[in-house]
Amino acid sequence: MEVSGVVLRQIPCVSSGSVAGLRLVSEFSGNTRTVGFRTRRFRGIVCNNEFADKGHVNYYIEPTRCGEEKEKVKVMEKEKKALKKKAKVLKSLSKNLDMFSSIGFGLDPEAGLVGEIQTKTISEATEILVKQLEQLKAEEKILKKQRKEEKAKAKAMKKMTEMDSESSSSSESSDSDCDKGKVVDMSSLRNKAKPVLEPLQPEATVATLPRIQEDAISCKNTSEALQIALQTSTIFPSMANPGQTLKTVEAVSVVGLPLNRVEVCMGGKCKRSGGALLLDEFQRAMTGFEGSAVACKCMGKCRDGPNVRVVKETDAVMTDSVRTPSKTLCVGVGLQDVETIVTSFFDEECSREGLGSVSY
């Protein structure tokens, strides 16, 4: 039997210098034996306090990581995420396994038919529920609109009642206590030219209407012209329209008040629009005349205020012992109208000419 082999043995160094070592090589080939020696160089130099080999330096000269390794890391991370997602899906499926079996996700074909029927019924039920929800939403919208309309109506009614509360409540009381009498709008009179009533006024300025001017020219003196003008018209020429008729209501005299007086309205709007100042001005203007200026409650026409009622005693007799004073309501009276009203109703010459009994 042939045997072949190689025996290696390192020969130790003889000297400490750079001497090449010997390696014994034995070769066996059949029955013959040959021995050979080969030299080997040391990679390092043996010195004091140094390593004999510099192989440890290669540790610090290793190549850095390239981009392929980074890509591999990314791929691994993606795979981990995919595995996590699959695990979550499997976990959820395992939890809802009973529900799927009840719906009909089974291997049995009959169970599949039952599942289809169940899905149809579920879809129909969902459609019905959706329709009911839409109907409820529409009803809620209609109710909201109705509520808004009711609120708006309530607000409008509240405003109307607040505006009319003073006038309505005062008109009811004024109808029972005192009459309305004659009504004169002072604001319309101020917009038109008024003649100045003086005893020595020329004829042309007193008689403003054409017919009155013709009658006044035919008179002999100014007193006759003034009398004709006052009989055919009133002291307020803007109200001398033949088509204008105002109602006169007989009044009952108030106990404790003078028969000849000027009543100034102290209602809400009349008082705010200067009723107190108007009362003071009337009291000042009535100092030289028979009568007085007093305050009274609302007359029911505060919308056109401030208002003044002139009460003057007349010769008309209801019974043997009761006289009926005439009442005239002046609407929209200003401070500039005080002198005109006082002189028109309470001047002696005007009263003799019948100014207090003239219809407006």
Curated annotation (Swiss-Prot):
What is the main EC category here?
transferase
Q: Which InterPro entries match?
A: Thioredoxin-like_sf (IPR036249)
Disordered as annotated region, ranges:
153-182
Keyword set, alphabetical order: 2Fe-2S, Acyltransferase, Glycerol metabolism, Iron, Iron-sulfur, Lipid biosynthesis, Lipid metabolism, Metal-binding, Transferase
Q: What is its EC number?
A: 2.3.1.20
Q: In which pathway does it act?
A: Glycerolipid metabolism; triacylglycerol biosynthesis
Q: Which cofactor does it need?
A: [2Fe-2S] cluster
Which branch of life, at top level? Eukaryota
Null mutant phenotype: No visible phenotype under normal growth conditions.
Reactions catalysed according to its record? an acyl-CoA + a 1,2-diacyl-sn-glycerol = a triacyl-sn-glycerol + CoA
Membership in a protein family: Belongs to the diacylglycerol acyltransferase family.
User: Can you name this protein?
Assistant: Diacylglycerol O-acyltransferase 3
Q: What is the lineage of its organism?
A: Eukaryota, Viridiplantae, Streptophyta, Embryophyta, Tracheophyta
Could you state a single Gene Ontology molecular function term?
metal ion binding
Q: Which GO terms describe its biological process?
A: glycerol metabolic process; triglyceride biosynthetic process
> Its biological function?
Involved in triacylglycerol (TAG) biosynthesis. Catalyzes the acylation of the sn-3 hydroxy group of sn-1,2-diacylglycerol using acyl-CoA. May preferentially use linolenoyl-CoA as substrate and to a lesser extent linoleoyl-CoA. May contribute to the active recycling of linoleate and linolenate into TAG when seed oil breakdown is blocked.
Annotated [2Fe-2S] cluster binding sites: C265, C270, C298, C302
Gene Ontology CC terms: cytosol
Instruction: Give the gene symbol.
Output: DGAT3
